[in-house]
Amino acid sequence: MATPHNEGGGLYAGGLCGINTIVKHFDVISDKQIILFSCGLADPEDPENVAHIESGLEKVLTPEMREKIRQFHLRGGIDYSRLGLTHKAMMAMLRRVMLKKGYDNLRSEDQMMLDTYGGTVDFTNRESLAPLLNYVRSLP
């Protein structure tokens, strides 16, 4: 039976860090059970967030890849003090875009991002790993 191959990465504005590794080597790993997991600030229980993540993946994964790859989306956290210059600049740009929209016009999740900007927030929940772990355990 095919050996599993897993790949996970952080979400940055809907794009998945490391996804190009799967795309580049898909022909080599396509006979394996491929598991892709993402981790980001966006709540994966929110259908709008999932649609945004899926939209980003559709831009880089072919229909064959999407059919073959089992996906799991998890929620993480952020500690601004540990961000590098590039990521700090990205977050500052995102903040400016949100501020232009007006606080009251933002979704509650975006308001929370503004409220915690520059600090530390952690949404990790070990229980949310259960579907991923159960899937891995079910593999032959």
What is the predicted function of each stretch?
Residues E7-L11:
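Glycine-rich, N-terminal phosphate-binding loop of Rossmann-like dinucleotide-binding domains
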Residues P4, G14-P140:
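FMN-binding flavodoxin-like domain, especially the glycine-rich phosphate-binding loop
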